[in-house]
């Protein structure tokens, strides 16, 4: 996986709650121009759970087309890590095959939610999906969402036994897990899935981030990651500290509720629309977001 900084993209909706494809393309181009290595369409932040199968595939397609046709400032191409998560292995497998067919660089696959599979079930789920494609696969551990964690031995077994499982997105909140994974397998790439822990995970052996805050501040997230990769940890920490209040504000309610409203307040999307069961943030949250964006001089 030849990327380090990336954003878990929001999926903008029109007022009628259809996907705003033009706005989506614009958001991806902004990521490209502000230095991100990759984008991650239709993950948790992209509200994949409320997209139809057709919409899910179309969002992946737009991301790939936009990255293919838009050069980065260094005249390269931004990579696409396509979200293919589902609580049905067959559906994830179908999405994985589609993503590979149309040119995704890699796929991100979350553990099945609601089903609460055993560790053997998780192993078979990921193994089945990975063996259906040739492109790299990133595991996604977020037990607060899925109800079950990919335990360290299971993650290591997947990495060791399935050749194209190359990385894991760590959103467990446990630095102990990160340390263990890196200790036992230095080549198992670890990406931070917790903005508040980006610097700490990079310092503990991580090689990149998949950021929610990056939707709003891609340039700063990219700078932080690049500093950490160059072992300029003090500079990376300064950027992490600079983003602290923003990271906090963007998670006062369930993601992606705050980030979509923040993007709207910043003038980056026209409609802060959500599909049920997600609803608009509270008045108090909107006020906090406005105050925070003023603090960062994003809005006047």
Swiss-Prot record:
Active-site feature positions: 140 (proton donor/acceptor), 169 (schiff-base intermediate with substrate)
Keywords: Amino-acid biosynthesis, Cytoplasm, Diaminopimelate biosynthesis, Lyase, Lysine biosynthesis, Schiff base
PROSITE patterns for this protein: DHDPS_2
EC number: 4.3.3.7
A single GO molecular function term of this UniProt record: 4-hydroxy-tetrahydrodipicolinate synthase activity
Catalytic activity of the protein: L-aspartate 4-semialdehyde + pyruvate = (2S,4S)-4-hydroxy-2,3,4,5-tetrahydrodipicolinate + H2O + H(+)
Chain sites annotated for binding pyruvate: 45, 210
Keyword Lyase: yes
InterPro entries found in the cross-reference section: Aldolase_TIM, DapA, DapA-like, Schiff_base-form_aldolases_AS
The organism's place on the tree of life at top rank: Bacteria
Subcellular location: Cytoplasm
Record pathway: Amino-acid biosynthesis; L-lysine biosynthesis via DAP pathway; (S)-tetrahydrodipicolinate from L-aspartate: step 3/4
GO BP term (any one): diaminopimelate biosynthetic process
Site (Part of a proton relay during catalysis): 44, 114
NCBIfam families cross-referenced by the UniProt entry: dapA
Subunit description: Homotetramer; dimer of dimers.
Family listed: Belongs to the DapA family.
Protein's name according to its UniProt entry: 4-hydroxy-tetrahydrodipicolinate synthase
Gene (name only): dapA
């Amino acid at each position: 996986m030849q990327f380090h900084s990336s954003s878990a993209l929001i999926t903008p909706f029109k007022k009628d709650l259809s996907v705003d494809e033009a706005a989506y393309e614009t958001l991806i181009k902004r990521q490209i121009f502000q230095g991100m290595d990759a984008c991650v369409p239709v993950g948790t932040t992209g509200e994949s759970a409320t997209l139809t199968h057709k919409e899910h595939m179309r969002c992946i397609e737009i991301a790939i087309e936009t990255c293919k046709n838009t050069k980065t400032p260094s005249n390269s191409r931004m990579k696409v890590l396509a979200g293919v998560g589902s609580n049905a292995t067959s559906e994830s497998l179908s999405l994985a095959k589609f993503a590979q067919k149309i040119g995704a660089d890699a796929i991100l696959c979350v553990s099945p939610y609601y089903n609460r599979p055993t560790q053997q079930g998780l192993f078979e789920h990921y193994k089945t999906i990975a063996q259906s494609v040739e492109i790299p696969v990133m595991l996604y551990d977020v037990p607060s969402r899925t109800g079950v964690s990919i335990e360290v031995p299971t993650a290591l077994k997947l990495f060791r036994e399935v050749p194209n499982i190359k990385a894991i997105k760590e959103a467990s909140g446990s630095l102990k897990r990160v340390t263990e994974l890196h200790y036992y397998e230095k080549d198992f790439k670890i990406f931070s899935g917790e903005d508040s822990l980006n610097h700490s995970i990079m310092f503990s052996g991580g090689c990149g981030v998949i950021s929610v805050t990056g939707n709003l501040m891609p340039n700063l997230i990219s700078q932080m990651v690049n500093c950490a990769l160059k072992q300029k940890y003090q500079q990376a920490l300064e950027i992490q500290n600079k983003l602290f209040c923003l990271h906090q504000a963007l998670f006062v309610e369930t993601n992606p509720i705050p980030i979509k409203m923040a993007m709207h307040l910043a003038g980056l999307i026209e409609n802060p629309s959500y599909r049920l069961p997600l609803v608009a943030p509270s008045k108090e949250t909107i006020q906090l977001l406005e105050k925070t964006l003023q603090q960062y001089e994003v809005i006047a």
